[in-house]
Amino acid sequence: MEHMKLHHVGIVMNSQERADRFMKKFGLETDYMEYVESYKSNCLFTKHKEDETPIELVIPLEGVLATYNNGKGGMHHIAFEVEDVEEVKRKYEAEGMKLLEESAVPGAGGIIVNFLRPRFGEGILVEFVQKLKK
């Protein structure tokens, strides 16, 4: 497998208020926020410079992410940018690993995503991100 570029770090926040406090505490600003239907969450990405990695604050409105870490939120995933999410899925599955979704789902900001299950990522939930062509 070739080297993958870090795309973002995902943190689940159990409320918009907590997300706002986190942003203020660390001098972060919103780049964009979008509702992601497949995860029933508002996903906020921070502004960042060219050589920096953004943070994604996932604010679940309902569903499984609302109960993440007993409803407290916290560190959730790291995301790598890939050319082709479906090709990555095929490669990992050929090695006996499983991803969360049957096929990639839309994410915030013009991307599609899928996640490697934590038991195959050494305990870490790993997201694969493919930017859609404009």
Model-derived features with residue positions:
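Long, hydrophobic N-terminal alpha-helical segment
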Residues: M1-Y39
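Extracellular structured ligand-interaction cores
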Residues: L6, M75, L125
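Short secondary-structure capping micro-motifs at structural edges
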Residues: M33, N42-C43, V64-A66
